[in-house]
């Protein structure tokens, strides 16, 4: 079967986007997702995005996200920005703002006149059981309004914030994000048994109260050039710890995101993420068996 696709990226976090809205697509297996995402024998991507018709009232579209390891995940901020550019560029909507069904709910995406996309990422969740994170038997320590949890990582105790942005995140503050051994500690944190669904590991360097450098080792994808939900989780943790003030400029290897959150006043407030979305190319590929 021939499969039309669009290759896109948001701040270097790259995606294969498939249109299941205007055409019927067969259910994709994990092996097929891995083959399409393979950078040597397929198209190459951190994740695959599938555009579908919504199944809930009040949503314009539904989108599903698959990591390059073939597993389906809950949310992707950079993918959400690419999603709204895709549906507008392909004439699926003329709206500047669309409501999109994702695995954990409905989010609102808005295309700005300057081409950037603003995503209402929803409110962060800090309760360990809802992340989910097993904090049983651990003695946390308070910093600001946050609780930091000790996690043994390669023989060293790391103090982490746990945050859900619809997907689980473990955030730690480091002195130098560029020099930190992200690809050593990242896999150990991702698969720590206290995270039953595994976790995205964020390593944040605070540059000023409005600026950070961030690297994220993503669950099922490894280190990526940018992670939208990771940026939101890091900023939320930093504000809650009293280290940051909104808005925050987040520098990643792939580009810059702007995160705003009024959480110092109301932790139920949604995080707003602004950043670019870029189409790289379009093509046709034979769907692997």
From Swiss-Prot:
Enzyme class: isomerase
InterPro entries assigned: DAP_epimerase_AS, DAP_epimerase_DapF
Residue sites binding substrate per the record: 13, 47, 67, 77-78, 167, 200, 218-219, 228-229
GO term, biological process aspect, one: lysine biosynthetic process via diaminopimelate
Reactions that this protein is recorded to catalyse: (2S,6S)-2,6-diaminopimelate = meso-2,6-diaminopimelate
Name of the protein: Diaminopimelate epimerase
Locations listed in the record: Cytoplasm
EC number, as in UniProt: 5.1.1.7
GO cellular component: cytosol
NCBIfam families, A to Z: DapF
Biological role: Catalyzes the stereoinversion of LL-2,6-diaminopimelate (L,L-DAP) to meso-diaminopimelate (meso-DAP), a precursor of L-lysine and an essential component of the bacterial peptidoglycan.
Site (Could be important to modulate the pK values of the two catalytic cysteine residues): 169, 218
Highest taxon in the source lineage: Bacteria
Annotated metabolic or biological route of this protein: Amino-acid biosynthesis; L-lysine biosynthesis via DAP pathway; DL-2,6-diaminopimelate from LL-2,6-diaminopimelate: step 1/1
Keywords assigned by UniProt, alphabetized: Amino-acid biosynthesis, Cytoplasm, Isomerase, Lysine biosynthesis
Quaternary data: Homodimer.
Pfam families linked: DAP_epimerase (PF01678)
Major place of residence: cytoplasm
Family the UniProt entry places it in: Belongs to the diaminopimelate epimerase family.
Enzyme active site: 76, 227
Gene: dapF
Lineage: Bacteria, Pseudomonadati, Pseudomonadota, Betaproteobacteria, Burkholderiales
GO molecular function, one term: diaminopimelate epimerase activity
């Amino acid at each position: 079967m021939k499969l039309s696709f669009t290759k896109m990226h948001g701040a270097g976090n790259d995606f294969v986007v498939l249109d299941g809205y205007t055409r019927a697509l067969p259910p994709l297996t994990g092996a097929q997702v891995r083959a399409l995402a393979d950078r040597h024998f397929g198209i190459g991507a951190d994740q695959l995005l599938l555009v579908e018709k919504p199944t809930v009232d009040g949503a314009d579209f539904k989108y599903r996200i698959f990591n390059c390891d073939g597993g389906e995940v809950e949310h992707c901020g950079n993918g959400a920005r690419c999603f709204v550019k895709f549906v507008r560029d392909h004439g699926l909507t003329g709206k500047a703002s669309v409501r999109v069904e994702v695995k954990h709910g409905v989010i609102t995406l808005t295309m700005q006149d300057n081409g950037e996309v603003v995503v209402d990422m929803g409110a962060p969740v800090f309760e360990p059981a809802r992340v989910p994170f097993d904090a049983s038997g651990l003695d946390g320590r308070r910093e600001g309004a946050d609780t930091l949890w000790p996690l043994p990582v390669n023989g060293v105790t790391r103090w982490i914030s746990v945050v859900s942005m619809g997907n689980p995140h473990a955030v730690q503050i480091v002195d130098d994000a560029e020099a930190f051994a992200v690809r050593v500690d990242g896999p150990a944190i991702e698969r720590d048994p206290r995270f039953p669904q595994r976790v995205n590991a964020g390593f944040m360097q605070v540059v000023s109260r409005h600026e950070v450098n961030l690297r994220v080792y993503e669950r099922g994808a490894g280190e990526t050039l940018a992670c939208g939900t990771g940026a939101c989780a890091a900023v939320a943790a930093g504000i809650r710890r009293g280290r940051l003030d909104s808005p925050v400029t987040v520098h990643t290897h792939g580009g810059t995101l702007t995160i705003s959150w009024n959480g110092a006043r109301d932790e139920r407030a949604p995080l707003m993420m602004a950043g670019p979305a870029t189409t790289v190319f379009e093509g046709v590929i034979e769907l692997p068996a």
